[in-house]
């Protein structure tokens, strides 16, 4: 195992050692986060609002520069994520995400609208990558893997799942 880690580090592709195992109060595998972040050692999550039962917003930064914006809402009215993405100018090349019924992946952006608890309200997870869309479009699969892994844990932390 140590030989593999040294080999990967020597290639310059292993950023996971600098990435916390929690982002925005949510446990996440660092290997899923690493491809979404620029090179750098000083990875921090900075809450932009206190985590509450209905709203959480934070920024993941590397070297003091914002890299990811993660926003969660619970208790929201449901809406069609793909229709929303097609109407919003922030979504470039939106398409349905795999593995989540009402979710969209776009160049540098992910949004999912899923049931929150047993009520009729919804949880919304909105993730934005802070990079040019020309770079972000090459990371769609990685963003989707990260987001679909973050989603169920984030829903528990915000109170949608027990």
Question: Where are the regions that the model predicts?
Answer:
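A small/polar (G/S/T-enriched), proline-flanked helix-loop surface module common
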Residues: 13-162
């Amino acid at each position: 195992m140590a030989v593999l880690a040294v080999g990967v580090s020597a290639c310059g592709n292993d950023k996971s050692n600098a990435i916390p195992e929690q982002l925005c109060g949510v446990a996440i595998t660092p290997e899923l986060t690493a491809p979404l972040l620029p090179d750098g050692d000083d990875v921090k999550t900075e809450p932009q609002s206190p985590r509450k039962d209905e709203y959480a917003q934070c920024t993941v930064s590397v070297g003091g520069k914002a890299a990811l914006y993660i926003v969660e809402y619970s208790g929201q009215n449901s809406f069609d994520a793909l229709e929303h993405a097609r109407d919003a100018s922030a979504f470039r090349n939106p398409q349905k995400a795999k593995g989540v019924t009402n979710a969209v992946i776009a160049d540098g952006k992910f949004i999912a609208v899923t049931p929150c608890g047993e009520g009729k309200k919804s949880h919304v997870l909105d993730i934005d990558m802070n990079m040019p869309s020309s770079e972000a479009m090459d990371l769609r699969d990685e963003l989707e893997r990260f987001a679909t892994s973050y989603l169920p844990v984030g829903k528990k932390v915000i109170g949608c799942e027990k």
